[in-house]
């Protein structure tokens, strides 16, 4: 294939090699083998028009004949609602983060018209007016749609300028309203409209916005928060809106939405959801449910156990607190830090462990509880049905099974069993439905503590509940507190998703201080993704236009990033003529360098990991290099994939960190909501965006662990660490001792005067009102005489040539030069006579 402008060849055209059914993934329905039986066979989008050939490219293109999701002969909603694309996207398991190749093509086929119209803000507004009423899927989670709505029809938005929340974007246009399906059990008023587009819920106050480069945002009107859902079209088609925590808050979510956290007993469900205040909830948890393990479900990741805590000191049984020099002092310091951050009383709900600690047992120590099922011991590898991921009844299909590999647990060493949740998101349903749901009880005897196995489990997050009812998560990896959910029911649907997408919410200062939002990740808000290779400045020229980018994303045999992400990225780099290793190395060098704090004791050089000499260093390879992620994205990556060996690259910057000196101890139930908000806002104003000085249970490999007193204060060593870049020891010169001097009273500053002949000093002026004309001269002290300035040296002697002679010689030389050149110097002008000013005549008053 011929080269274009010295770059890599053009990708294969769309629609070739897929048979006679039309272009693959663009404007055509999926193959019949991928559509369940009973599904309608209508076209999924309005882009299935006759193919036209663009001059100069020779590429088989597809031009849409109408708005996406509807042919010219039908309404905007009916075709997609009953089409195969909706049925295909409804079978995405809740544990999966990315879409497969077929689901990716179905997602892009529906959004094709919006992508091609994303050139200017005016073009996007025209598109929203032309395709008003069209339903577009959000990919993940299933059951959520974007109903295209002009801005004039959005209630409460008004003249809101979203660029104030994202100054990097040149323009942001609100184009759609976010709606979702409704569960008839949770909302009986829906009735027969539960499976119809008219029965969708639009009461969340969420709107979809598009920016330049197809950056997708979700705007929360109630909280005035802008959430970055995707940085480009490729990320939007691959992941959808599944990382937006705000989507999972509504209690009216339908059956088709991803399932909620599976609780072992209906009684525990009632305890968590019907608690009126945190004090009563904490008392009930300590009395009845301490040590119980809950299989926590988070969208986009595997199930993981959460052990309910009976007391704060129980965290000493888990890493990284168990390996600290003094676990009790470290826990006291962390509790003091949480008091300063939350500014109110709080309750420790549980410790979230990695997924490998999730196992099955016969039940708690007292036996199998009611409402639970005990799987067989020798079950081996089990399969999981889609549960709440199945489409609604109108689709007439059931989700496929998803195999789950066996995982070790505790000392028994069985298989991790993921159980389908029949009631899906109906966490507020009846007790009978909750009791009938198949659940699994993971008892405290199986894996609640380190005594059940040879290794100590690591607490990835500590779930907290404050007086306002909000759920937070303390991350021992970096020592920060992150918001997880607005309430407990929201937490049971979203899990720890708030800690897996850090730095993607932008809000005003007051709102960010009230909700304790983390700092914005500038790497995500201001720069494109490192693996979005079609946006790289050295990419092929044909990939810089919308049609070229579309052909690149939906080319034949692009691959699937789920099974082999490295091969997927290598294929993209090879198509665009880029070197993946070079791209990763350049992006890694642009990240901020690490910082080792002054108060952090560094290990001696012989205990640190020294890099090999240059002669033994191998050439970096993309397969072995870590992804170039920012600090917040790196923490999210470690929490998502349970990287227990993760360590922070830097410590707290001592010169720029803000040290909170508040020693207040808050008790549950003693603070008003307004007082809590004012305390948080005051501290955020004093901090001014600086980094928080905090205890870090996990420290970098180059440092020792921190030391704390019994009151929770950090012990600062007398001999601090040396600078990181200094190879030589600093040397200091010994100063001679200063002899003792006799104390003298302070006197007036001396006046400097000349010594030697000179004009006599002027007599001092006579003071007003004095009768005596004689004034005595000021008396000079001995100290003043010693500090007198020495006389100036005489001017240098030039023999007979004095300054007057030199000036006369220079004047003569100037006149000679002027005479020899023929120009006579112009004589000076005579002085002008002063004009006599006439005075006005004096007025004589008679």
UniProtKB/Swiss-Prot annotation:
Biased composition (Low complexity): 26-56
Subcellular location: Virion; Host cytoplasm; Host nucleus
GO molecular function: protein serine/threonine kinase inhibitor activity
Region described as Disordered: spans on this chain: 1-82, 366-385, 606-626, 714-846
Keywords from the named record: Early protein, Host cytoplasm, Host nucleus, Host-virus interaction, Inhibition of host innate immune response by virus, Inhibition of host interferon signaling pathway by virus, Inhibition of host PKR by virus, Interferon antiviral system evasion, Transcription, Viral immunoevasion, Virion
Stretches with biased composition (Acidic residues): 722-732
GO biological-process terms attached to the record: bidirectional double-stranded viral DNA replication; symbiont-mediated suppression of host innate immune response; symbiont-mediated suppression of host PKR/eIFalpha signaling; symbiont-mediated suppression of host type I interferon-mediated signaling pathway
Annotated GO CC locations: host cell cytoplasm; host cell nucleus; virion component
InterPro entries on file: US22-like (IPR003360)
Basic residues composition bias: residue spans: 832-846
Transmembrane annotation, as ranges: none
Keyword Transcription found: yes
Major site of localization recorded for this protein: virion
Composition-biased stretches (Gly residues): 16-25
Record-stated family: Belongs to the herpesviridae US22 family.
Subunit details: Interacts (via N-terminus) with the viral DNA polymerase accessory subunit UL44. Interacts (via C-terminus) with host EIF2AK2/PKR.
Record's function text: Inhibits the establishment of the antiviral state in the infected cell. Prevents the phosphorylation of the host eukaryotic translation initiation factor eIF-2alpha and thus the shutoff of viral and cellular protein synthesis by directly interacting with EIF2AK2/PKR. May also participate in viral DNA replication by interacting with the DNA polymerase accessory protein and the lytic origin of replication, oriLyt.
Name of the protein described by the UniProt record: Protein IRS1
Organism, scientific name: Human cytomegalovirus (strain AD169)
């Amino acid at each position: 294939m011929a080269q274009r402008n010295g770059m890599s060849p053009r990708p294969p055209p769309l629609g070739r090699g897929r048979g006679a059914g039309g272009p693959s993934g663009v404007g055509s329905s999926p193959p019949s083998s991928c559509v369940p039986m009973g599904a309608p066979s209508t076209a999924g989008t309005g882009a299935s028009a006759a193919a036209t050939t663009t001059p100069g490219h020779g590429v088989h293109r597809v031009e849409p004949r109408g708005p996406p999701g509807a042919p010219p002969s039908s309404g905007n909603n009916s075709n997609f609602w009953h089409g195969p694309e909706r049925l295909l996207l409804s079978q995405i398991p809740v544990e999966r983060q990315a879409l497969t190749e077929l689901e990716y093509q179905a997602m892009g086929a529906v959004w094709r018209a919006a992508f091609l119209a994303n050139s200017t803000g005016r073009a996007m507004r025209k598109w929203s007016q032309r395709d008003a009423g069209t339903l577009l899927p959000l990919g993940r989670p299933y059951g959520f749609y974007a109903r295209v709505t002009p801005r004039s029809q959005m209630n409460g938005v008004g003249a809101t300028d979203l660029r104030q929340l994202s100054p990097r974007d040149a323009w942001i246009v609100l184009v759609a309203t976010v709606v979702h399906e409704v569960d008839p059990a949770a909302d009986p008023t829906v009735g027969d409209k539960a499976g119809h587009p008219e029965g969708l819920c639009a009461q969340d106050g969420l709107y979809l916005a598009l920016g330049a480069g197809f950056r997708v945002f979700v705007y929360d009107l109630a909280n005035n928060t802008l959430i970055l859902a995707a940085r480009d079209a490729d990320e939007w088609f691959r992941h959808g809106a599944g990382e937006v925590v705000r989507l999972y808050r509504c209690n009216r979510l339908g059956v088709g939405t991803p399932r909620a956290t599976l609780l072992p007993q209906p009684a525990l469900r009632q305890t968590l959801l019907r608690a009126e205040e945190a004090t009563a909830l904490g008392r009930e948890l300590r009395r009845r449910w301490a040590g119980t393990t809950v299989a926590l479900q988070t969208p986009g990741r595997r199930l993981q156990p959460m052990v309910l805590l009976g007391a704060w000191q129980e965290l000493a049984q888990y890493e990284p607190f168990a390996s600290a020099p003094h676990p009790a002092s470290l826990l006291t310091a962390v509790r003091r830090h949480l008091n300063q951050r939350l500014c109110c009383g709080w309750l420790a709900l549980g410790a979230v462990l990695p997924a490998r600690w999730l196992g099955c047992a016969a039940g708690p120590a007292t036996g199998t509880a009611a409402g639970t099922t005990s799987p067989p011991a020798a079950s081996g590898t089990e399969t999981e049905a889609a549960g709440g991921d199945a489409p609604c009844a109108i689709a007439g299909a059931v989700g496929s099974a998803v195999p789950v590999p066996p995982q070790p647990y505790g000392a028994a060493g069985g298989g991790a069993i993921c159980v389908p949740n029949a009631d899906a998101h109906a966490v507020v349903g009846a007790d009978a439905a909750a009791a009938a749901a198949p659940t699994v009880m993971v008892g405290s005897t199986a894996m609640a503590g380190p005594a059940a196995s040879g290794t100590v489990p690591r607490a990835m997050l500590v779930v907290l509940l404050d007086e306002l009812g909000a759920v937070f998560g303390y991350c021992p990896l970096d020592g920060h507190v992150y918001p997880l959910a607005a309430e407990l029911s929201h937490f049971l649907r979203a899990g720890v998703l708030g800690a897996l997408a850090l730095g993607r919410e932008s809000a005003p200062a007051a709102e960010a201080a009230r909700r304790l939002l983390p700092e914005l990740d500038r790497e995500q808000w201001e720069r494109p993704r490192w693996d979005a290779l079609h946006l790289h400045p050295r990419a092929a020229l044909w990939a810089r236009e919308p049609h070229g980018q579309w052909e690149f994303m939906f080319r034949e045999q692009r691959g699937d990033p789920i099974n082999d992400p490295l091969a997927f990225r290598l294929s993209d780099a090879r198509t665009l003529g880029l070197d993946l290793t070079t791209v990763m190395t350049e992006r890694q060098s642009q990240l901020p360098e690490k910082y080792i704090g002054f108060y952090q004791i560094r290990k001696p050089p012989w205990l640190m990991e020294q890099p090999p000499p240059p002669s033994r260093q191998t050439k970096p390879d993309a397969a072995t290099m870590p992804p170039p992620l920012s600090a917040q994205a790196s923490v999210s990556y470690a929490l998502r994939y349970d990287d227990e060996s993760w360590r922070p690259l830097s410590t707290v910057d001592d010169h720029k960190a803000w040290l909170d000196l508040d020693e207040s101890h808050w008790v549950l139930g003693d603070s008003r909501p307004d007082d809590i908000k004012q305390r948080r806002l005051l501290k955020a104003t004093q901090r001014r965006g600086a980094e928080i000085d905090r205890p870090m249970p996990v420290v970098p490999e180059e440092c020792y662990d921190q030391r704390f007193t019994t009151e929770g204060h950090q012990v600062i060593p007398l001999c601090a660490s040396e600078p990181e870049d200094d190879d030589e020891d600093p040397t200091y010169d010994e100063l001679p001792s200063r002899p003792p001097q006799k104390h003298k009273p302070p006197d007036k500053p001396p006046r400097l005067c000349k010594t030697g002949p000179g004009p006599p000093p002027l007599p001092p002026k006579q003071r007003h009102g004095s009768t005596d004309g004689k004034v005595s001269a000021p008396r000079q002290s001995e100290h003043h005489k010693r500090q007198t300035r020495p006389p100036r040296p005489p001017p240098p002697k030039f023999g007979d040539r004095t300054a007057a002679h030199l000036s006369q010689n220079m004047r003569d030389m100037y006149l000679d030069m002027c005479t020899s050149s023929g120009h006579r110097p112009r004589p000076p002008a005579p002085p002008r006579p002063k004009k006599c000013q006439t005075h006005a005549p004096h007025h004589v008053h008679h």
